[in-house]
């Protein structure tokens, strides 16, 4: 049946709070609450159209599917598993109590047809849904979900290029959507000013309201004057500017303005829905996308080419310039910018050594809705990892500066060994009553062992295995076997159709012994696949980590 097509509903969704169950167990209550949390108006970019973030990244295929998912989760037995196919609940099957309660597959296409044109045809027929990464896998926590990764990137860039000190320096970037909205706060936390260009005033307003950006300039001259003043004063202030990056970056080049760092996080991965062509209004863009999609895609990619050319010009000035994973270089290359890949992606430039040790975006949310539960887990993290001053600094800054969106949540980058240690501790806190309700633990699909994305996470692998996508499939299979609460397998997140495959995992800490056993398996195995993947590619850091952690890798450690 393909007649269910309602994508707009004027309704406000918020997850239940407290300890009263609306489902039959916490293992089904958790995905229910996190699905609804993804559509909380304080969390999602366009919740009335089911869009969570990232262009058209949705939580459910349409409202009829959302209703049926909610109803099914409320009635799901403790030994049943719900299957979700591109945002549509398609089956409930008898499994067992340690099996996942939900298995999700979003946006997956046979490789020959894995492109936006074919996907958009399916989407128009209500046969597919773009799940992005954490939108369709129900573990989005707002812009906080990427803040620390962006912060770690800026800090490492500062270490490499500016002797570890970003005071008095400024970052030029664009995009203040659900992901890009993390950039201004991350730059501030790293000690730098930032100029953040955004073409939708509503997105700027959202970031101002949630304190991710400090202030808005009236025009480019005003923005540059503020940057000049704040950098001279050594203040780390973030500035939003309403405009089109494909116009403003070339103008900055023309003026000879020299930022200290340049990147971008517009929704360039989706030219039909996420990147405004030069000279167009947003309303015109959306209307023409319906009537003449091919022309719109062409116009958007032409503007991306101008944007990337300006980034290349900044690189020629000696400005550290990097792609932040939105595939804008690929789009520009397809429009004739032959050297678009002359500036690197952020993973090979700054993050890969962390991935080699299984370190990535570990996140958790308090199903109670009580911020105190998160503050107590913050303290537990510090207690269990007493010597990591960098992590403690992050947690302190996060508590001070990051506003919770929807259910209270936290993210911190930790790796193999520590994830299981923290998960077991959180489960014990639930068992003892120290936390008022269960905790869910998940992560971004952007992690060390869960993604194949040659223009982002697996760019420039030293053995040339950038495009091998067996790894996220193995990761999903292993997490399913280990007893995760829900597991997802997606295509196209971050960089768009045809350019990535990736998997997600979420596990519930409900305070039971059974949960502890599942947590120990899943939160060990999941980051271990990242160490395995990088060790297999020949990275010495990963090989040494595998040996230190006692991983059984037949071709490497035996």
UniProtKB/Swiss-Prot annotation:
Sorted alphabetically, the keyword list is:
Cytoplasm, Histidine metabolism, Lyase, NAD
Name the Pfam families on file.
Urocanase (PF01175), Urocanase_C (PF17392), Urocanase_N (PF17391)
Q: Which GO terms describe its cellular component?
A: cytoplasm
Cofactor(s) recorded for this entry are: NAD(+)
Q: What does the entry give for GO biological process? A: L-histidine catabolic process to glutamate and formamide; L-histidine catabolic process to glutamate and formate
User: Which locations, inside or outside the cell, does it occupy?
Assistant: Cytoplasm
Residues reported to bind NAD(+):
54-55, 132, 178-180, 198, 244-245, 265-269, 275-276, 324, 494
> Gene3D superfamilies under this entry?
Urocanase like domains, Urocanase superfamily
Catalysed reaction(s) here are: 4-imidazolone-5-propanoate = trans-urocanate + H2O
Q: Does the keyword ATP-binding apply?
A: no
User: Which residues constitute the catalytic centre?
Assistant: 412
Q: What PROSITE patterns is this protein classified in?
A: UROCANASE
Q: How is the cofactor bound?
A: Binds 1 NAD(+) per subunit.
Q: In which pathway does it act?
A: Amino-acid degradation; L-histidine degradation into L-glutamate; N-formimidoyl-L-glutamate from L-histidine: step 2/3
Source species, domain of life: Bacteria
Principal place of residence? cytoplasm
Q: What Enzyme Commission number(s) apply to this enzyme?
A: 4.2.1.49
Q: What does this protein do?
A: Catalyzes the conversion of urocanate to 4-imidazolone-5-propionate.
Q: Family, per the entry? A: Belongs to the urocanase family.
Matching PANTHER family: UROCANATE HYDRATASE
Q: What is this protein called?
A: Urocanate hydratase
Q: Which organism is it from?
A: Acinetobacter baumannii (strain AYE)
Q: What is the lineage of its organism?
A: Bacteria, Pseudomonadati, Pseudomonadota, Gammaproteobacteria, Moraxellales
Gene, per the UniProt record: hutU
